[in-house]
């Protein structure tokens, strides 16, 4: 894993990159851990805004998964948001190996304005995207739990 705050310090622009995008706490890092079959590969947290860099994960010699910081986190400072916007713009505009974006949305809050903006961002840079609705499992009390 390699995290960068400046795209010039990113791994070589080769092979195939698939970017994981979405609002804070939409399940990007959890999905990455699931795909890699390693629960500790990407840092997860119940607190939004933990991923602060673009994190590159080498899956094979040819394939990288790229975990982006979540967007839409209201407590992010104006300066941090501006830096994040600049970083994302430089990533999407410069990476020739970027094949597609997987945009994660919590099924309880799908298609927020920030999700639409990310889709428009992908369209601007001609990056195909795949929307994925994630399910946040909530605790079901015993009396309401179905019997299977």
Describe each region flagged by the PLM.
Residues 71-81, 137:
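Flexible beta-alpha connector loops of hexameric P-loop NTPases
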Residues 1-73:
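Conserved G1/Walker A P-loop phosphate-binding module
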Residues 72, 110-111:
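Catalytic P-loop NTPase motifs of RecA-like helicase/translocase cores
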Residues 138-148:
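Single conserved hydrophobic/aromatic residue that forms the stacking wall/gate
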Residues 80-108, 120-127:
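Inter-motif core of Ras-like GTPase G domains
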Residues 134:
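Active-site glycine-centered loops adjacent to acidic/histidine catalytic or metal-binding residues
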Residues 115:
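Acidic (Asp/Glu) carboxylate-rich active-site/surface patches
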Residues 63-65, 102, 130:
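Hydrophobic "anchor" residues on beta-strands that sit immediately upstream
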């Amino acid at each position: 894993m390699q995290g960068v705050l400046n795209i010039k310090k990113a791994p070589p622009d080769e092979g195939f990159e698939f970017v994981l995008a979405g609002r804070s706490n939409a399940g990007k890092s959890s999905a990455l851990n699931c795909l890699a079959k390693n629960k500790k590969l990407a840092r997860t947290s119940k607190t939004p805004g933990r991923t602060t860099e673009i994190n590159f994960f080498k899956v094979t010699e040819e394939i990288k998964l790229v975990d982006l910081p979540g967007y839409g986190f209201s407590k992010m400072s104006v300066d941090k948001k501006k830096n994040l916007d600049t970083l994302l713009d430089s990533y999407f505009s410069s990476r020739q190996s970027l094949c597609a974006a997987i945009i994660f949305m919590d099924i309880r809050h799908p298609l927020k304005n920030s999700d639409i903006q990310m889709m428009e961002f992908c369209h601007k840079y001609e990056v195909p995207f795949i929307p994925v609705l994630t399910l946040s499992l909530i605790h079901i009390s015993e009396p309401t739990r179905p019997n299977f």
